[in-house]
Regions:
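Bacterial N-terminal signal peptides
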Residues: 1-9
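Conserved, mostly hydrophobic/aromatic
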Residues: 30, 65, 99, 174, ...
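Aromatic-lined carbohydrate-binding/catalytic grooves of carbohydrate-active enzymes
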Residues: 48, 52-151
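Aromatic-lined carbohydrate-recognition surfaces of secreted/lumenal glycan-active proteins
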Residues: 104-120, 166-183
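Glycan-recognition surfaces
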Residues: 126-129, 173-274
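Catalytic cores of secreted or luminal carbohydrate-active enzymes
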Residues: 257-306
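Carbohydrate-binding surface patches
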Residues: 262-265, 270-272, 308-351
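C-terminal beta-strand-rich structural cap/linker in extracellular carbohydrate-active enzymes
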Residues: 377-400
Length: 400
């Protein structure tokens, strides 16, 4: 029994060492599922890697190109997983080499069950074998789903794959996609780099879609389910609010709000649109340097809601160097006026042990979308369009 315990402990330490430096800020990249589902092949992945460089996504910080479900073929006589020979005739190793040649990283998908959500071979019973295969191919990121896994213990199943990745000899970011069913935030910090907190995102701002076999949540519904979870997030271990739907049909105001919310909440930023054909407005939204800087702030603290006044909510995120990000969110489909008297506010966060009394400290602010500037010596007044945000970065004295 002692030997088993020591073995598990040593493997856990090994994983920590190999994972060192991965996801020190929320991971940024692209995933095939939201836009393409099972309609994927190696040409799409290559063209997406090209577009990631050509459109400035790589320069903005997006680095992972992740293949989701349906890349699988069958297992060979020795049980080794093979890619679909029609979709990926060159093989995954050649694809990884191509992506790496662009200065990017390649991610892949599997499932804790015997079959994936798309009905392809999962990793159940083949965890160590699959991890070795991924390492041999040059994989940098593993998204691990939870279909066909009803009889399994989630923590044990994900820990097995964590240990398999550690033993493979190649560092890989490990993304748990368990949909929040078994409260992964309570145990996954020592298992993976991020964990999904909700069912899948659906391409809408405020809706819930249940086609009968699954549930899809809009942006606001996912935000609401983050209540109480911020204490579990931090460098190397993040609450994952699912992939982005920016550029997939919501309004520009909704797209800006969507990215802002994910950045404030320190969720991974995984693009879910077609990078090859996105509009210039979508590209500008997704590469906004100020919003991305909030997402990637090295302090790694998730935002807290500090005000809820009807459809208007205010979220605050402490940043490195004594700065703050502040987001005013209009949840309504009607415009909302903001009249914010800074001097009546004391901004306090028990988690980061930070507090600002605006009577004593004047902070400058910059609007991360409009580029307007001001300071907290005067009231903030603005009109928020439906489903929009005002996102500010506060800079000033570090005295708290």
């Amino acid at each position: 029994m002692l030997g088993i315990f020591l073995g598990a402990a040593l493997c856990g330490n090994s994983w920590a060492q190999k994972a060192e430096g991965l996801a020190s800020t929320p991971q940024m990249g692209w995933n095939s599922w939201n836009k393409f589902a099972c309609n994927i092949d190696e040409r799409l992945i290559r063209e997406t890697a090209d577009a990631m460089v050509e459109t400035g996504m790589k320069d903005a910080g997006y680095q992972y190109v992740n293949i989701d479900d349906c890349w699988h073929g069958e297992r060979d006589a020795d049980g080794n997983i093979q890619p679909d020979p029609k979709r990926f005739p060159s093989g995954i190793k050649a694809l990884a080499d191509y992506v790496h040649g662009k200065g990017l990283k390649l991610g892949i998908y599997s499932d804790a069950g015997a079959t994936t959500c798309g009905g392809h071979p999962g990793s159940r019973g083949h965890e160590y074998q699959d991890a070795r295969t991924y390492a041999r191919w040059g994989i940098d990121y593993v998204k691990y789903d939870w279909c066909d896994a009803q009889s399994l213990n989630a923590e044990a199943a994900y820990t097995t794959m964590r240990d398999a990745i550690a033993k493979s000899g190649r560092p890989m970011l490990f993304s748990l996609c368990e949909w929040g069913i078994n409260k992964p935030w309570e145990w996954a910090g020592q298992v993976g780099h991020s964990w999904r907190t909700t069912p899948d995102i659906y391409n809408c701002f405020d809706c819930e879609f249940s086609p009968g076999f699954s549930t899809g949540l809009g942006v606001l519904r996912i935000l609401d389910r983050q209540a109480g979870l911020r204490k579990f997030a931090g460098p190397g271990h993040w609450n994952d609010m699912d992939m982005l739907e920016v550029g997939n049909g919501m309004s520009e105001d909704e797209d800006r709000a969507h990215l802002s919310i994910w950045a404030m909440m320190a969720s991974p930023l995984i693009l879910g649109n077609d990078l090859r054909s996105m509009s210039e407005s979508t590209r500008r939204i997704l590469t906004n340097p100020g919003v991305i800087a909030v997402s990637q702030d090295k302090l790694g603290v998730q935002a807290l809601r500090v005000l809820a006044d009807g459809p208007l909510e205010v979220y605050a995120k402490p940043l490195d160097g004594g700065e703050w990000a502040l987001m005013f969110l209009n949840r309504s489909n009607q415009a909302v006026d903001v009249h914010h008297d800074w001097k009546k506010q004391i901004l306090t966060d028990d988690l980061s042990k930070r507090s600002v009394d605006f009577k004593q400290n004047v902070y400058g602010w910059s609007d991360l979308w409009s580029k307007k500037t001001g300071d907290t010596s005067t009231k903030l007044q603005a009109r928020l369009a439906p489903h929009s945000v005002l996102m500010l970065r506060l800079t000033g004295p570090a005295k708290t």
